[in-house]
Amino acid sequence: MNNLNSENMCNCCNSANSCGGTNGISWDREKCEYCGPCAIKCPNDAIMVVNPKGLELPSRAKTERANEFKMCDLCGTCVSACPTEALQMGKIVHNEKEYDRIEFTPSLCDSCGACVEICPQNVLKLNEEYKLKGFCVMCLKCIDACDKTNQNALSLK
């Protein structure tokens, strides 16, 4: 599954080539070369890329798939599904503009997995060390990594 529906339209903003919610990070599939620095730099594993050689990043697992991109699009489905309110929609300011972001309070998380099961992008993961990974905190490290490749496939909306 990726962020595009069967008509190759973004599930959240309904545009043809970009994805990333209505107020966050936009992905332009026409510019993307699936090279993966964005996934590697993301501190919360909110991006998964399968490169042309079939290497899934950031995990570096070999797969038969190729050229796949998934990211947290800040849709808030996980927040709605969380029975303990460990996940909340928050705000962050970049360049004087306010953006949505997901905030996580580990002490409230009961590891029920409701958020993981309902995530439409299939990027959330429960683990023992951090409890939950895969949600976007809008740190913008992915955009910086993509800019360094001169692809500019990721940008702020």
From Swiss-Prot:
This is Polyferredoxin protein VhcB. It comes from the Archaea. InterPro entries: 4Fe4S_Fe-S-bd, 4Fe4S_Fe_S_CS, Polyferredoxin-like_ET. GO terms for molecular function: 4 iron, 4 sulfur cluster binding; metal ion binding; oxidoreductase activity. The gene is vhcB. It comes from Methanococcus voltae. SUPFAM superfamilies: 4Fe-4S ferredoxins (SSF54862). PROSITE patterns: 4FE4S_FER_1, 4FE4S_FER_2. Binds 4 [4Fe-4S] clusters. Pfam families: Fer4, Fer4_7. Coiled coil: none annotated. Keywords: 4Fe-4S, Electron transport, Iron, Iron-sulfur, Metal-binding, Repeat, Transport. [4Fe-4S] cluster binds at residues 32, 35, 38, 42, 72, 75, 78, 82, 109, 112, 115, 119, 136, 139, 142, 146. Its cofactor is [4Fe-4S] cluster. Residues 23-52, 62-92, 100-129 form the 4Fe-4S ferredoxin-type domain.
